[in-house]
Amino acid sequence: MQMIDIRPPDPRHFISGSTGDWEVVIGMEVHAQIVSDSKLFSGASTKFGAEPNNHVSLIDAAMPGMLPVVNQECIRQAIRTGLGLKAQINLKSVFDRKNYFYPDLPQGYQISQFHYPIVGEGKVTISIGPDSNGQFEDVEIGIERLHLEQDAGKSIHDQHPTMSFVDLNRSGVALMEIVSKPDMRSSEEAKAYITKLRMILRYLGTCDGNMDEGSIRADVNVSVRRPGEPLGTRCEIKNVNSIRFIGQAIEYEARRQIAVLEDGGVIDPETRLFDAAKCETRSIRLKEEAHDYRYFPDPDLLPLEFDQAFVDALASELPELPDDIKARFINDMGLTVYDASILITEKEIADYFQKVARGRDGKMVANWVINDLLGALNKNNCKIEDTPVKPDQLGAIIDLIEEGIISGKIAKDLFEIIWHEGGDLRQIVEERGMKQVTDTGAIQSAVDEIMANNPDKVSQAKEKPALVGWFVGQVMKETGGKANPQTVNKLVKMKLEID
């Protein structure tokens, strides 16, 4: 397949070699497992984690006379994905046989789509940053195509010293192969691309995105060249299943190719594997070309055809996607690009935030979700679906602050109590004496005492207004964080005769 490079050189991405600058060019073929109860051409289950060879039909095992039947839900999921990628949906596509031998491929061929894929060109917009000025840069990564294919089985080599085993549970599972254009110029962009693509798939509900289960695997194509020169010879790094590993593999492979070229060598078009333990790639074979697979239309499957009305009906049911939600958070709620970007990283986080933000100040809610909730989740290695602090509880904590019943500091203590113990918020505040002190007389007594004990700072305050904050902090400490901060600030300024 001929790839056309249209992105101009950018010195920010150049790699310095011993003989001058180089540019890395990256494309990606992402295999995303479709969310479906059954496989692409059989009724066997797709559930992960079953005992070996428990989810295998006669079709998956390639028994003679068994004919494939297309799973319509997999077709719908592929179209939904294409729409989410703003791609061309092809109303007619064809299944081909991709011929090669491997022990975990019982048919001796893989059913795929080569000449006429179900989805054509699209795009994914990634956001790089923030830079030193807090700015983000949007970069558009082109999608060449999306086609459907069936997964192979799994060869297992570590169960016996002299024998290998084959598990066909995965054989026939529906995959979407999403092929990007060679538009990425750094490992950072590649990681941002796979992160964004995974995010879109999860929002659409077409792939669960669980990389640790193999639901998303990436073949990363890497080449290097002098800036402005034609594309170099690419090497393909197969089946990288971690975003961090994708970045490490690209960094190593780019440096390896540069070293070979600067030493007077040539790059062979290879298929390589990434060794995570050694953080390096190694060759496994010379790269195959399309003609090596002898593609031809599968005679057991008719061309796949549907009309535009079918596509339009699916388009009308699409959920709101990350970029649209991010724009709404920024434009309607006044969030920063940074905060909005964090809140959309996972659909569950965005949903949680929106539940809490309903009828409340979006910026304040964002601050609590990002700093307190996500911080607690990371600290406790917990997913947001399992958080002990539910959206209505966090919303109630924020309401108590807004009503002046508790201070911001006490609110954080209350959050910790709910996280670890649960319980009724207002009852906890009442029983544990957490209510905010609003009695001006009591606060004034604390202010007077602190000023009496620190006459030197009182005398310096008019020249150093920043000391107001120190006095406020001392009063808050003296009252156990229960004093109303606004009242404290007002009284301190009045006592110090500072406007």
UniProtKB/Swiss-Prot annotation:
It comes from Bartonella bacilliformis (strain ATCC 35685 / KC583 / Herrer 020/F12,63). GO terms for biological process: glutaminyl-tRNAGln biosynthesis via transamidation; translation. This is Aspartyl/glutamyl-tRNA(Asn/Gln) amidotransferase subunit B. NCBIfam families: gatB, PRK05477.1-2, PRK05477.1-4, PRK05477.1-5. Heterotrimer of A, B and C subunits. Keywords: ATP-binding, Ligase, Nucleotide-binding, Protein biosynthesis. The lineage of its organism: Bacteria, Pseudomonadati, Pseudomonadota, Alphaproteobacteria, Hyphomicrobiales. InterPro entries: Asn/Gln-tRNA_amidoTrfase_suB/E, Asn/Gln-tRNA_Trfase_suB/E_cat, Asn/Gln_amidotransferase, Asn/Gln_tRNA_amidoTrase-B-like, GatB, GatB_C_1, GatB_Yqey_C_2, Gln-tRNA_amidoTrfase_suB_CS. It catalyses: L-glutamyl-tRNA(Gln) + L-glutamine + ATP + H2O = L-glutaminyl-tRNA(Gln) + L-glutamate + ADP + phosphate + H(+); L-aspartyl-tRNA(Asn) + L-glutamine + ATP + H2O = L-asparaginyl-tRNA(Asn) + L-glutamate + ADP + phosphate + 2 H(+). Belongs to the GatB/GatE family. GatB subfamily. One of its GO terms (molecular function) is ATP binding. Pfam families: GatB_N, GatB_Yqey. PANTHER family: GLUTAMYL-TRNA GLN AMIDOTRANSFERASE SUBUNIT B MITOCHONDRIAL AND PROKARYOTIC PET112-RELATED, GLUTAMYL-TRNA(GLN) AMIDOTRANSFERASE SUBUNIT B, MITOCHONDRIAL. Its EC number is 6.3.5.-. Allows the formation of correctly charged Asn-tRNA(Asn) or Gln-tRNA(Gln) through the transamidation of misacylated Asp-tRNA(Asn) or Glu-tRNA(Gln) in organisms which lack either or both of asparaginyl-tRNA or glutaminyl-tRNA synthetases. The reaction takes place in the presence of glutamine and ATP through an activated phospho-Asp-tRNA(Asn) or phospho-Glu-tRNA(Gln). The gene is gatB. SMART domains: GatB_Yqey. SUPFAM superfamilies: GatB/YqeY motif, Glutamine synthetase/guanido kinase. Coiled coil: none annotated. It comes from the Bacteria.
